[in-house]
Amino acid sequence: METLIELSKKMPKTELHLHIEGTFEPEQMFAIAQRNQVELKYSTVDALKAAYQFTNLQDFLDLYYQGMSVLLHEADFYDLTMAYLEKVHSENVVHVEIFFDPQGHLSRGVGFDVQIQGIYKALQDAEKKWGMTSKLIMSFLRHLSEESAFETLELAKPHLKWIDGIGLDSSEVGHPPEKFLRVFEACKNLGLKVTAHAGEEGPPDYVWQAIEQIGVDRIDHGNRALEDNKLIEAIKQRNLTLTVCPLSNLKLCVVNDMKNHPIKNMLALGLNATVNSDDPAYFGGYMNDNYASLINGTRISKEELFQLAKNGITGSWMEDHLKELHLKQLHALFA
C-alpha cells in the first residue's frame, strides 16, 4: 500500500508562500559571489554551510542579507529563480506564487528592472519547459517606511503587467499592517491582489488589521489567529486562505515540535490552510520536506493531506481552468 509520504510526493502541488531570496543554497551563493567578486564572511562552501545551522532569527537575517548582497545582475536573479523552479518541478509543484523584496536590492543600488527582468524571464522559461505556471508578488519590507513603499510602487509601475500581487513581510512585531494602509489602497486601485504576513510572531490584532483595514485576499502564516475565536470565524466568513509554513515555524521556534503544529487544528476548524516552504534553503526543506514533516510529526490523515493540497489549488491566484485541471488530477490520484 502506498504511504502518505509517497502520495504527497506524487500529488500536484502549489507553492503560495515562497521568498525567492530564501532559496539561495550555499553552493549557489558561493558561486555567484565568486562570479561577481563579492567577498562573503565565509572562506569556503563548508564554512557557509555551517552558517546555515543558525538557531535564532538574527543569525538567520544576517545570513539572508549576506546572500542578497551577491545578487547584482539580471543573470543572478535569473539563475537564483531558475534553480528554485527546477527543484520544485522535480517535486511535482505545478504552480508557484513567488515573493520578491525589491527594497532590499534597491538599497544596494540594484535597479528594479534588473531584479524583475531576471526573475520574470525564469518564470517564463519554466512555463515553456515544463508548463509550470506562476504569479509574481512584490513585497514591501514592513520595517521600512510607508514612504519607501510608495517610492517602490512608483518604480514598479512600468512593470505592472508582470506583477500579480503585493505582499508585506520582514520583522512583524512593532510594524502593524495599518502602517501601510494607504499604499495598499493604491495597489488595490491598480488592480493588484494583496496579501500580508500576519500572526506569525505578531498578535491576532495584526490579522484583524490585515482583514478589516487592508482587505487582504490572503493571509501569510496566520498561526496566531487561532488565539481568537471571533477572528477564526471572520477568516472563514471571508473564505481566506492561510499560507502556512511548517518547517519555517519549527526553525524559527514559532512551534517547538512538529507534533504541536497547529495545521491539523486549522483544518478541523474549517480554515483553508495550505503547505508552503517560505525560505526553503534556510529552513531545512522544500515542498516535499514540508509535507513529510507534517505526515511524520502531526500524523495527518489521507483526507487531511488531500484537503491541504486542494486548498493550495483553490487558494491560489491561478486561472479557473487551471484550477479545474489540477483538481481533477488530484482527485484521480486520491480516488
From Swiss-Prot:
Substrate binds at residue 279. The active site is at 200 (proton donor). One of its GO terms (cellular component) is cytosol. It holds the Pfam family A_deaminase. Binds 1 zinc ion per subunit. It catalyses: adenine + H2O + H(+) = hypoxanthine + NH4(+). This is Adenine deaminase.
